Every structure is written in C-alpha cells, then in structure tokens.
Amino acid sequence: MTHYKVTLAYDGTNFAGYQVQPKQRTVQGVLQKALTKMTKGQPVHVDGSGRTDSGVHALGQVISFDYPGNIPAESMLKAMNSLMPLDIEILKAEIVDADFHARYSAKGKRYLYRVARGYYTNPFNRLYTGHYPYKLDVQRIEVALKDLVGTHDFTSFAASGGVIVDKVRTIYEATVREDSVTNEIIFEFYGNGFLYNMVRILVATALEIGNGRRDVHDFQRLFAVKDRQQARGTAPASGLYLKEVYY
C-alpha cells in the first residue's frame, strides 16, 4: 500500500456536500468511485480534512488514502484528474508517511467568504458569493473582527447540527477587505478548527455589525452568553470557500 496526500479544488454547487450520502452526488463519493475504477474494483476509502456542506466550495481541500500499488505522485495526479468531472480539479498529489491523516494531522484551516454588494443579485456570481444589499460600514467590521482573535468559546456560533461538545476554538486571523473591481467584501478566517456552520454564522453577525444593527463589540457579548439564538443568522453556503489546510 502507498499512502497519498492529495489537494483538490471543487465547485460545491452541484454536490450534496463532501461526505458520502446514499443516492446523493458528493465529493467524497466521486473521488472514491474514481480511485476504485483505477484499482479495477478494489474499494479505496478517502479521508478528508473536513466536511463541506452542500453549495460550499474548496480552493484547497486535502484528502488522504491508501492505494494498492506504488504509482508516482505525478502519475497519480494525472490519473485522478483524467477521471474527475468538470467541477473537481486535483491540484497536487504527494506520497506521505502512513501515519498522515488529512483530518487528524491538520493544525489549522483558512476559510474565505465572499459577499457581493449592491441592491440586486448578480445572476452570474450568485452561486459563488453571498449577497448583502444593505449599507455597510466596513471599518466597523474591521474593528469587530479583532475581538475574534484568540481562544474563545464559540457556542453562540455553532449550528445545532454539530456533534462536537467542546466549542472552544482559537482564531489566529480574522480579516475583511473590499474588492472594488468585483464590488465584494471578502472575509478570511484562520484558526485551529471550526464548528459546524461557524464561519457562516460569524459572517452573518459581522454584516449586522457593519449595518449598525449590532454593537461593534457584540462578538464579546455573544462569547459570554453562549446562546446560538442570540447570533441568529447564517450566511448562505454559496459564498464560503475552504481556502487552505495547514499541517
């Protein structure tokens, strides 16, 4: 057996998320089907760095798997890409030690979230951005995001569908910038781990701060109350991208 680490990008629009689900098109399912075809029927199980929901995209998802035989990394890259649909691209393949695990070896992740501005929804980017038609003070958001940096209990920012009990996470970077060319604001979050829907809830809260509906330091209050109902909103899946996984 040879152990591989593979980095890939995908458009999440037409996937029911990353994880295999019965009778659903998923990223993991497509990958495992392709690898099983390469082995002429011997099943190959793929481990991902994390699960992305339906509609969420990836610029740098990482998977790991054992493969029967010893194919050079560059040949694995080419072989996998030859079997990929148009909405998945294999970016890099590496042969790694057997103890490497895409999820459990990860030290951190970076997510990007794109928000389209303007009153009307652009039909050409609606599947790849969130949309916020109301006024925004980006400087207020910049101030607010500084409160996220550090180690906090993110109970208020975890959707109920998650199964993880410990809600404490560390955020190393939380930034926002304006793109005048695309008329978007772009959030980036880098941390040691993220809870179910956490980034989308953080973005929704930050937008309300930028709009003046919340106090500029409301993140601090939400950390203290540990109540998901206090944060309320969740930004659409379409604007979220798993940008990079760190090991």
UniProtKB/Swiss-Prot annotation:
One of its GO terms (molecular function) is tRNA pseudouridine(38-40) synthase activity. GO terms for biological process: tRNA pseudouridine synthesis. Its EC number is 5.4.99.12. Pfam families: PseudoU_synth_1. The keyword Isomerase applies. It catalyses: uridine(38/39/40) in tRNA = pseudouridine(38/39/40) in tRNA. PANTHER family: PSEUDOURIDYLATE SYNTHASE, TRNA PSEUDOURIDINE SYNTHASE-LIKE 1. Homodimer. This is tRNA pseudouridine synthase A. It comes from Lacticaseibacillus paracasei (strain ATCC 334 / BCRC 17002 / CCUG 31169 / CIP 107868 / KCTC 3260 / NRRL B-441).
